[in-house]
Design a protein with these regions (language model features):
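Small-residue-biased structural context
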Residues: 1-145
Length: 145
């Protein structure tokens, strides 16, 4: 497995654990849920920024596709859908409502195929298509996000 794939798959696994921690915290009490959700929200946004600012533009450049008709454009739409769900959860928590499981399930539905596309198409393609120098530069940029 290449550098980009390894790094991003590990980040996906870490995010899945942060998501599980939020779900568990929500079962405890409101304060735990809010603190855990804040961490989740921050980490998801960091991850999406990394992809949208570093990896997706590189993928589009190297494949010769535009941001309107590439695999990355679909992934960006899914990011937007997840962020809308995250905003819904935040609003629910702010209103004192811990019943966010159905919104969490929607996020999980979106993310299953999303992660598969990234892990099985985008990241491996980048690992194969980029020169060793481009991979070093990309790795450095990923670690700064």
């Amino acid at each position: 497995m290449g550098i980009i794939s390894s790094f991003m798959r590990a980040d996906h696994e870490r995010l899945a654990e942060v998501f599980r921690q939020f779900s568990a915290a929500r079962e405890k009490d409101m304060e735990s849920a809010k603190v855990s959700f804040s961490v989740l929200d921050s980490e998801v946004r960091r991850h999406f920024d990394l992809e949208e600012q570093v990896l997706f533009p590189l993928f589009e450049e190297k494949t010769g596709t535009s941001s309107l008709n590439s695999k990355a454009s679909v992934l960006r739409i899914e990011h937007k859908q997840v962020l809308e769900c995250m905003c819904r959860i935040k609003s629910m928590l702010d209103d004192g409502n811990l019943e966010t499981a159905y919104v969490e399930n929607r996020i999980l539905e979106i993310m299953k195929s999303h992660r598969d596309n990234e892990n099985n198409i985008v990241y491996p393609w980048l690992d194969e298509a980029l020169t060793s120098e481009e991979i070093k530069e990309t790795d450095s940029r990923m670690r700064k996000c």
